[in-house]
A protein has these predicted regions:
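Alpha/beta enzyme core
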Residues: 2-242, 246-275, 279, 283-290
Length: 290
């Protein structure tokens, strides 16, 4: 069955997405960091992720490590105000789910109070305790395995994971442990396509790939990557569907030229005084200082 790009109308839910996976329908997820990106993407995708990637995409950081709960809350609230139909997932930033189950629950619960439908956290077996704690509090959790950006220092950079036998088998074990702990879906990032396919076929929950080949239950890309809004290095797994950076610069350049040439604004883009005030304004002079 093929699908068009027509807008989705019904509100996405976790059971719905899991049913789609059983039916063979692929899930589409992208990032949203503010109300504008949410309104553009929401009619089209199934999941909106308020990702901690906001740090390097929008806030100028080199990676996601400096992103705080306060920053994530700010961006989540902006997206949630649009009342999206897509499932709204918020990323747990670095050190927001590491110290204790109590703090993890408090932070994740704050996301749900601000409008998120679920949270996403990175890591495998080490995170099982936190996942169970959240699920026991009725907080839906999406897991994230493979190239986990918050582990960039431990991994020695943004490198493909799971290319060695031990690493590949560990990832498969981690995927099952996260499923058993209650995750409703898993992001698989930066791993060989064959490994992602094996994980997907062995799980009952959806997998959402990014740099993990075509045989996941769905795919996610950063909004700005899809639209070509980023300069510089583009990862191999990114397919860009527009040169948004150039298009926006060209539009701004045309506007700037119109301003400098005195052709913006015109009378059609200006407000007019009532006719009876024209003479009053024309005859105005500064009052003398007292």
């Amino acid at each position: 069955m093929s699908y068009t790009s027509e807008a989705r109308v019904e509100r996405a839910t976790i059971p719905m997405l899991q049913r789609w996976t059983q039916e063979g329908r692929r899930i589409v997820m992208t990032t949203a960091y503010d109300a504008v990106t949410a309104r553009i993407a929401d009619p089209i995708v199934d999941i909106l992720l308020v990702g901690d990637s906001v740090g390097n995409v929008c806030l100028g950081f080199e990676n996601t490590l400096p992103v705080s709960m306060a920053m994530m809350n700010h961006h989540l609230e902006a997206v949630a105000r649009t009342k999206p139909r897509a499932l709204l997932v918020a990323d747990m930033p670095f050190l927001s789910f590491h110290l204790s189950p109590e703090e993890t629950i408090r932070n994740a619960g704050g996301f749900l109070k601000r409008g998120a439908d679920a949270v996403k956290l990175e890591g495998g077996t080490k995170r099982v305790e936190m996942v169970r704690a959240l699920v026991n509090c009725e907080i839906p959790v999406m897991g994230h395995l493979g190239l986990t950006p918050q582990s960039v220092n431990a991994m020695g950079g943004f490198k493909v994971q799971g290319r060695k036998a031990d690493d590949a088998l560990r990832l498969l074990d981690d995927a099952h442990r996260l499923q058993e702990a209650g995750c409703f879906a898993l992001v698989l990032e930066g791993i060989p396509a064959e490994l992602a396919a094996r994980a997907t076929e062995s799980l009952t929950i959806p997998t959402i790939g990014i740099g993990a080949g075509p045989r996941c239950s769905g795919q996610v890309l950063v909004f700005h990557d899809v639209l070509g809004l980023m300069e510089g290095h583009r990862p191999k797994f990114v397919r860009t569907y527009a040169n948004g950076f150039q298009l926006l610069q060209e539009a701004l350049s045309r506007w700037a030229a119109d301003v400098r040439n005195g052709v913006f604004p015109t009378s059609q883009e200006s407000y007019r005084l009532p006719e009876d005030l024209g003479e009053t304004i024309a005859n105005w002079a500064p009052s003398s200082p007292t």
